[in-house]
């Protein structure tokens, strides 16, 4: 019997990659429940904007907008969900500046227009809410009442990503067995 290695599920893995001569910082989570696995990827863009790549969304979604859609209304709530450390909150500044969305409802509408363009607004919003509940971190739950846990987990992932950028932590070793799952038949 041969074991198949895979990255650990439901764990935040941070990494720095060279893309076109530039360093790109990423945080990945393979959220898994029985029979379903969804990859969430957070990317720190060159201009300081943190975006999320979610299955079911053809475009990157600014993480501040995503956290607003999950129920955090104020900038202070979002910054506190990420970290209480001033240096990390300062790194979030450009993410706040580049986001025009100010309410939870506006954030859901923003996401809905990007994932289901050209459809009826009612259908767009339903699709966006389904994405938030089922496509985003399903291991934390698939109901609207699980959105608070999702914002906390997302905040933790953004914090770890910014800590990597600031040089406070090292990139996670993908080859370390602590970051892997070994699957066997049966």
Predicted regions and their residues:
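N-terminal non-catalytic structural scaffold regions of very large proteins
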Residues: 1-185
């Amino acid at each position: 019997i041969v074991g198949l290695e895979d990255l650990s599920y439901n764990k935040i893995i941070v990494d720095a990659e060279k893309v076109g001569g530039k360093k790109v910082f990423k945080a990945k989570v393979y959220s898994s429940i029985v029979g379903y696995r969804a990859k969430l990827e957070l990317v720190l863009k060159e201009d300081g904007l943190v975006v999320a790549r979610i299955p079911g969304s053809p475009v990157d979604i600014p993480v501040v907008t995503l956290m607003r859609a999950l129920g955090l209304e104020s900038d202070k709530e979002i910054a506190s969900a990420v970290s209480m450390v001033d240096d990390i909150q300062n790194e979030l500044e450009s993410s706040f500046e580049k986001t025009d969305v100010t309410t939870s409802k506006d954030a859901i509408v923003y996401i809905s227009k990007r994932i289901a363009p050209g459809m009826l607004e009612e259908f767009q919003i339903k699709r966006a809410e389904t994405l938030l509940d089922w496509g985003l971190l399903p291991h934390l739950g698939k109901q609207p009442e699980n959105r608070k846990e999702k914002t906390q987990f997302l905040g933790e992932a953004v914090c770890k990503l910014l800590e990597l950028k600031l040089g406070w932590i090292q990139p996670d070793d993908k080859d370390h067995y602590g970051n892997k799952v070994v699957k066997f038949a049966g």
